[in-house]
């Protein structure tokens, strides 16, 4: 198999660069068969020009001009038949809309609020009817909000349709009655009262075929439907076929005879004969296949979000695997999730959502495709389209170009209408969608774009042997640590807890759980290092725990949580879609001979009165969990009881000398249950969490293991708590004899920074691009250990205080679901907590900063 060369123009440009770029070559090509590509990551200086620094440490410098959308997370783009308009949906947390962009003015000419939709959209073959996937059945609370915000009876009734329908003519959309599929529709007569959620539906991909046929992918029941419609009604009962686990997209071959279906959770593509609707084959591809596009030559390109790759299928096999990451040797973390093919079939464009770029690939030679370069985008590109003339690329970004500052509170139903009683917005509402308009670059411009994309990646220090000074000494000291305890807590922002610490960048006016409530957290922050520039990678618990455990959230999680948290529902899925293909920290430990144990994190149990608990958590933790934790699921028991279980095992380890190298513990009580009658008060709940932290640190520091132990503490997310810097800024601690004393470390860190530092200690390789590139916490460590022990500080508040049966906030809290983390509306819960603890004071706005690094 011959080695492939880089593009000659790119190679020529390389020779003209300075010495720091010597050797950079985009030798980033696919080979014949399924062999992967080779390449090199250049050592680039910081690019010139304005850049936005994200909370995760990555920069964005989006190319082109930008069209704001009324909502977030655009997932599909469709051109009008005459090519004058681009139709774009938004399917995130706030406005779900279908938007018509006038390409002559690059402005949204029309926006239709559809309430809910998802990942499928197509025009029929005559270009007069637009079909849009309806996603799942919304929660009753969403319907109530929609009704309260002025939704018409027709709009409310439309939510029961699995497929939305709009007429299209001359750049204008007109809503029509939606389409039903037997078994997938809701009972419209029960909307909004006595509404029953249809758990069998979550409609994703759509494709329009010949003679009025169209094809519907239902992710929820692993089924594809074929049916026919005319202008007014469905002509016949649909024909269905089972495909792989959780299908996502469908694409018709150029001749219309074959339908390809990407099986999102099954690492495969199913091929269906459109005449007989028979499955005639399934081809294995990469992890988490999502979007697909056919070439006129019969090749099918499949984006594999969990493999940093595109599979090229020709005939009955994969003939190429094209790596789309910045280097072909990169671990996962690029997340290709959208494709566009130039009209001449020579260029493939691939949106790398988590790299914030579009890969440009020469696919003109069917034997060997080549990655030519990358175009920088906004935050999380999620949709692509190439103009019919091939001259302009349209890039939809799921999270926008920058952070949106404080604004009046809105609901998922409509972003444009303020909500009475709530003054400020929820974190989901702070995300924004855009369409970037980028002229297709020539190779010289593409090379400049490529340099910028590389410059946007967080820069890592050089190898330790090349270092000198305190940071080198600190990193070498990490190797003296043999045991790591990783404590994950729930949902607190920095200023909520540490805003009253004068030495840090805090705002005491925003502090609701200050030193009086959390004396141990405060003492530990002041005795060791105060981390006042630490940010959660995740927005909410659904992605936050994934970032904590695996330094990555899959594209399924990123596309599902905005729907779930806005009460529009989400498709059911197991670890095949929810978990990182690279595994979690405990999987990393297992692969490299590091002992590990979980105390509650990802360690679910089911139980019955007549049988012992059965472990149903992460498969990689089977046999490595503390089963006593099953007695205290979320909302049951106290964190002090959980800490006692941990200390019991620590005492046993003292006797044997055997203690795991890596341990992870979940202490969730600081989530609180609001003012739910009979539950522990928010202050008592957070104080119990703080006592548990103090107990654990006290116990470890007095043990034989203290001399070579490090404890890392993080919140899974900041959940939009009040913070004057950014709504992602969160509470974290690092505690060890090798941690500095009495210092403030204002280095910008993220959740992935903690993961990276723990990996360095344990001798583990990075799992993803995010932990690999995150700044390790070297500035918090020292080469001179201090073995001073820590003594738990007793609670200064009543740990047993409970909420009264009535009073402000009781009724609102009773309406919330506290059966699991974030099942309660986090925005409502934060408002309840603020008004309970800061009576008479207006709830402050969540702040979103454009640049977070301390100058």
Question: What is each residue range found by the language model?
Answer:
Residues 13-14, 270, 291, 404, ...:
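Short amphipathic alpha-helical leader/targeting segments
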Residues 11-23:
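Bacterial N-terminal signal peptides
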Residues 3, 26-30, 36, 297, ...:
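Intrinsically disordered, low-complexity sequence elements enriched in Ser/Thr/Gly/Pro
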Residues 24-469:
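Predominantly soluble domains enriched in secretory-pathway, periplasmic, or organellar proteins
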Residues 1-4, 106, 112-118, 122-132, ...:
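Intervening/peripheral non-core polypeptide segments
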Residues 2-12:
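Bacterial N-terminal signal peptides that target proteins for export
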Residues 447-855:
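N-terminal pro-sequences and low-complexity stem/linker regions of secreted or lumenal proteins
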């Amino acid at each position: 198999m011959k080695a492939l060369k880089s593009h000659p123009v790119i190679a020529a440009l390389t020779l003209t660069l300075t010495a720091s770029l010597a050797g950079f070559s985009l030798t980033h090509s696919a080979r014949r068969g399924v062999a992967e590509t080779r390449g090199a990551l250049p050592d680039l200086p910081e690019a010139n020009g304005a850049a936005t620094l994200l909370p995760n440490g990555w920069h964005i410098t989006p190319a082109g001009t930008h069209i704001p959308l009324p909502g977030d997370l655009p997932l599909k783009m469709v051109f009008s038949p005459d090519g004058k308009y681009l139709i774009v949906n938004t399917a995130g947390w706030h406005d779900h809309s279908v938007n018509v962009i006038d390409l002559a003015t690059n402005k949204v000419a029309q926006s239709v609020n559809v309430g809910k939709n998802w990942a499928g959209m197509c025009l029929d073959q005559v270009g007069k009817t637009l079909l849009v996937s309806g996603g799942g059945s919304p929660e009753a609370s969403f319907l109530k909000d929609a009704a309260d915000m002025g939704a018409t009876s027709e709009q409310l009734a439309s939510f029961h349709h699995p497929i939305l329908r709009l007429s299209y003519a001359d750049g204008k959309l007109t809503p029509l009655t939606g389409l039903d599929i037997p078994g997938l529709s809701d009972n419209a007569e029960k909307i909004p009262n006595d509404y029953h959620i249809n758990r069998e539906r979550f409609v994703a991909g759509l494709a329009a075929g010949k003679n009025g046929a169209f094809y519907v992918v239902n992710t929820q029941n692993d089924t594809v439907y074929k049916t026919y419609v005319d202008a007014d009604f469905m002509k016949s009962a649909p024909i269905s076929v089972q495909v792989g686990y959780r299908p996502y997209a469908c694409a018709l071959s150029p001749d219309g005879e074959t339908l390809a279906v990407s099986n999102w959770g099954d690492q495969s593509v199913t091929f269906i004969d459109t005449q007989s609707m028979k499955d005639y084959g399934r081809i294995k591809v990469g992890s988490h296949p999502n979007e697909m596009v056919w070439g006129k030559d019969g090749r099918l390109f499949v984006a594999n979000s969990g493999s940093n790759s595109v599979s090229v299928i020709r005939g009955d096999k994969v003939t190429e695997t094209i790596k789309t990451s910045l280097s072909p040797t990169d671990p996962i973390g690029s997340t290709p999730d959208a494709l566009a093919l130039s009209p001449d079939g020579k260029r493939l464009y691939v949106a790398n959502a988590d790299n914030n770029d579009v890969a440009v690939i020469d696919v003109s030679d069917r034997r060997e495709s080549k990655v030519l370069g990358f175009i920088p985008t906004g935050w999380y590109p999620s949709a692509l389209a190439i103009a019919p003339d091939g001259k302009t690329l349209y890039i939809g970004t799921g999270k926008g170009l920058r952070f949106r500052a404080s604004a009046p509170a809105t609901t998922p139903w409509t972003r444009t209408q303020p909500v009475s009683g709530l003054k400020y917005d929820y974190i989901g509402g702070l995300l924004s969608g855009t369409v970037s308009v980028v002229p297709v670059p020539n190779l010289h411009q593409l090379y400049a774009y490529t340099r910028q994309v590389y410059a946007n990646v967080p820069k890592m220090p050089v190898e330790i042997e090349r270092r000198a000074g305190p940071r080198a000494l600190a990193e070498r000291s990490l190797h003296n640590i043999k045991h790591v305890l990783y404590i994950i807590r729930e949902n607190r922002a920095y200023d909520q807890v540490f805003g009253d610490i004068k030495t840090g960048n805090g705002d005491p006016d925003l502090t609701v759980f200050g030193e009086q409530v959390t004396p141990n957290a405060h003492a530990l922050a002041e005795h060791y290092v105060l981390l006042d520039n630490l940010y959660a990678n995740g927005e909410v618990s659904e992605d936050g725990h994934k970032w904590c455990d695996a330094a990555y959230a899959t594209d399924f999680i990123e596309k599902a949580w905005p729907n779930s948290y806005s009460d529009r529902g989400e498709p059911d899925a197991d670890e095949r879609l929810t978990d990182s293909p690279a595994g979690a920290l405990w999987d990393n430990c297992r692969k490299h001979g590091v002992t590990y144990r979980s105390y509650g994190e990802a360690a679910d149990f089911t139980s019955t009165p007549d049988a012992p608990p059965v472990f149903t958590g992460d498969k990689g933790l089977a046999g490595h969990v503390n089963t006593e934790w099953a007695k205290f699921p979320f909302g049951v028991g106290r964190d002090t009881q959980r800490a006692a279980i941990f200390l019991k095992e620590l005492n046993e380890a003292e006797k044997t000398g055997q203690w795991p190298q890596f341990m992870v513990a979940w202490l969730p009580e600081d989530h609180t249950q609001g003012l739910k009658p009979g539950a522990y008060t928010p202050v008592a709940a957070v104080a119990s969490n703080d006592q548990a932290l103090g107990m654990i640190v006290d116990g470890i520091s007095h043990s034989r293991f203290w001399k070579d132990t490090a404890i890392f503490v993080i919140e899974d997310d900041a959940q939009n708590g009040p913070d004057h810097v950014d709504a992602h800024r969160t509470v974290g601690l690092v505690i060890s004899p090798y941690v500095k004393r009495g210092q403030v470390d204002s280095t910008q860190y993220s959740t992935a920074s903690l993961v990276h530092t723990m990996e360095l200690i344990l001798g583990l390789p990075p799992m993803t691009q995010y932990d690999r590139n995150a700044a390790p916490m070297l500035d918090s460590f020292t080469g001179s250990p201090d073995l001073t022990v820590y003594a738990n500080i007793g609670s200064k508040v009543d740990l047993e205080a409970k909420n009264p049966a009535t009073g402000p906030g009781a009724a609102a809290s009773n309406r919330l679901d506290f059966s699991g983390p974030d099942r309660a509306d986090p925005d409502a819960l934060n408002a309840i907590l603020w008004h309970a603890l800061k009576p008479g004071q207006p709830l402050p706005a969540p702040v979103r900063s454009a640049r977070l690094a301390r100058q």
